Amino acid sequence: MSAPTKRENDRARINEQITVPEVRLIDVDGNQAGIVSTREALRAAEESGLDLVEISPTAKPPVCRIMDYGKFLFELSKKQAEARKKQKQIQVKELKFRPTTEDGDYQVKLRNLIRFLNHGDKVKITLRFRGREMAHQELGMKILERLQADTADVAVVEQHAKREGRQLLMVLSPKKTK
């Protein structure tokens, strides 16, 4: 007999797969029927036309319940799907600015930045310098400080402005809501 695979270990044992001499039985209505022999529990399950499912194999004696195993698996998969649906993937959006970004463009980008943060995404702000603009990095810092001030109510600075080559980078993440 080969060792059970991971898939077999994940599934609960049912009916004849339960080999222990006695089990703690929970009936169809969810009431405790006490500790009974496995044969008796199987007979009770067959009389009700349902399966005997081992719920807690590590308990002494193991806890078994009379239920429809197919329905049990379906409910379990529904719960897992619901849990997966509730998980939110956090994306990192990127907005690019220049030290010469005009006010109209700044307002449009700020609106997009706030929208991204409200959706729960992080935003990486890249401020790129070209040519002789590198001599005036204070203009870039002013833009980043202005962005930080304008988004103070919805964002937290996750990574403060730092220089990488010809760019300044800053990462904002949404404020935690209670």
Curated annotation (Swiss-Prot):
One of its GO terms (cellular component) is cytosol. The keyword Calcium does not apply. It is found in: Cytoplasm. Its main location: cytoplasm. It comes from the Bacteria. GO terms for molecular function: ribosome binding; translation initiation factor activity. InterPro entries: T_IF-3_C_sf (IPR036788), T_IF-3_N_sf (IPR036787), Translation_initiation_fac3_CS (IPR019813), Translation_initiation_fac_3 (IPR001288), Translation_initiation_fac_3_C (IPR019815), Translation_initiation_fac_3_N (IPR019814). Keywords: Cytoplasm, Initiation factor, Protein biosynthesis. GO terms for biological process: ribosome disassembly. Monomer. Belongs to the IF-3 family. IF-3 binds to the 30S ribosomal subunit and shifts the equilibrium between 70S ribosomes and their 50S and 30S subunits in favor of the free subunits, thus enhancing the availability of 30S subunits on which protein synthesis initiation begins. HAMAP family: IF_3 (MF_00080). This is Translation initiation factor IF-3. It comes from Legionella pneumophila (strain Paris).
